[in-house]
């Protein structure tokens, strides 16, 4: 081989390696393990390599623990996945370091199932799956789960109102 051809082959290998590494960074992990804890209606702990990994169900937002339907939502998620082996298709991490992902129990999309049962809202700020909106509409139309309340408060509104009340109380205390 000529010197020029050897250099061209080396350059091609470098480019291939760089491309491979770039695409590897885009791939997300898949976690598999039993669910060992249910934090609330959209957060679970999955045991992976003997370590609990906190997983936030992507694209949905369940009622907060102290919010109406918070306990029921947590219970519904527990009935679906507690002590079951699940697969998590990771889509990223949140600011708290939790894995964000879609949880599967066999072929069942647990995130979608929570919306279908009226146990969670579509998290509009982050949702990309348009099918979730239709599931939410159907749950609402059938008054399923939290939609039994004619005017349910979304978790993001609940959190905002709680922050505002807290700030008002701090200002009043000064």
List each model region and its residues:
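Small beta-barrel nucleic-acid-binding modules, primarily SNase/OB-fold domains
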Residues: 2-6, 13-16, 23-174
